[in-house]
């Protein structure tokens, strides 16, 4: 116990002078201070924005590794020593749970970001289809429309959005929607692409609409 000025009631007590006896308390105090700072910075129900500092986590682990259940070295573990060992185990468990929680909330936060991006890209699909048709008719060779198309493609590329569905590409029912199968052999490829597909990273936003054909003979 400490007085209001931060000094222990009995500075000479082994509990306050023995490094082994105080290491667990120091570790627990460090963990509590980290948790208090995190609670102030992150409102309830929101994902954590910052991780516990590597220096603090290393300090906690170092302090915990120095704890010996037999503090007085008499070969027997007293009730106080048993309680200290239990508190140390509890702190180790809480530290591991906090690390797992931090990783889980980070995954959830990234999932929310990806969902929002996918929603925006979905709303832009009609515009992308119009630009694709304009390119097929030769309207994107030059002029302001080409400049607009290039800028939009660059922005989407920065968001890891890419199109797929090219003639001759192997048919994949997971990402290609076949309107008609005109192939006669076992090997099926895209004979005609009616509408391009788009993906955001590993997430398919829209499948490609295609006609299946046979591969061209080389």
From Swiss-Prot:
PANTHER family linked to this entry: GRPE PROTEIN, GRPE PROTEIN HOMOLOG, MITOCHONDRIAL
Residue ranges, compositional bias (Basic and acidic residues): 23-40
Region (Disordered) residue spans: 1-75
Keywords, ordered alphabetically: Chaperone, Cytoplasm, Stress response
Annotated compartments: Cytoplasm
Biased composition (Acidic residues): 48-75
GO molecular function: adenyl-nucleotide exchange factor activity; protein homodimerization activity; protein-folding chaperone binding; unfolded protein binding
Example GO biological process: protein folding
Alphabetized HAMAP family for the sequence: GrpE
SUPFAM superfamilies with a match to the protein in the record: Coiled-coil domain of nucleotide exchange factor GrpE, Head domain of nucleotide exchange factor GrpE
Keyword Ion transport: no
Record-linked InterPro entries: GrpE, GrpE_coiled_coil, GrpE_head
Protein name: Protein GrpE
Gene Ontology CC annotation, any one: cytoplasm
Record function comment: Participates actively in the response to hyperosmotic and heat shock by preventing the aggregation of stress-denatured proteins, in association with DnaK and GrpE. It is the nucleotide exchange factor for DnaK and may function as a thermosensor. Unfolded proteins bind initially to DnaJ; upon interaction with the DnaJ-bound protein, DnaK hydrolyzes its bound ATP, resulting in the formation of a stable complex. GrpE releases ADP from DnaK; ATP binding to DnaK triggers the release of the substrate protein, thus completing the reaction cycle.
Keyword Oxidoreductase: no
The species this protein was found in: Corynebacterium glutamicum (strain R)
Subunit structure: Homodimer.
UniProt record similarity statement: Belongs to the GrpE family.
């Amino acid at each position: 116990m400490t007085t209001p000025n931060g000094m222990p009631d009995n500075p000479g007590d082994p509990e306050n002078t023995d490094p082994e006896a105080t290491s667990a308390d120091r570790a627990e105090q460090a963990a509590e201070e980290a948790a208090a700072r995190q609670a102030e910075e992150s409102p309830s129900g929101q994902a954590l924005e910052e991780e516990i500092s590597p220096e603090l986590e290393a300090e906690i682990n170092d302090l915990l590794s120095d704890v010996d259940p037999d503090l007085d070295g008499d070969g027997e573990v007293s009730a106080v020593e048993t309680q200290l060992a239990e508190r140390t185990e509890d702190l180790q468990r809480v530290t591991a749970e906090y690390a797992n929680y931090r990783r889980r909330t980070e995954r959830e936060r990234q999932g929310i970001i990806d969902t929002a991006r996918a929603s925006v890209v979905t709303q832009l699909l009609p515009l992308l289809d119009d630009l694709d048709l304009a390119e097929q008719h030769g309207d994107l060779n030059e002029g302001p429309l080409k400049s607009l198309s290039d800028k939009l493609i660059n922005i989407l590329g920065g968001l890891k959005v890419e199109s797929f569905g090219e003639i001759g590409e192997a048919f994949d029912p997971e990402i290609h929607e076949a309107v008609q199968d005109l192939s006669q052999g076992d090997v099926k490829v895209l004979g005609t692409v009616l509408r391009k597909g788009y993906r955001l990273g590993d997430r398919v936003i829209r499948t490609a609409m295609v006609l299946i054909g046979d591969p061209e003979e080389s």
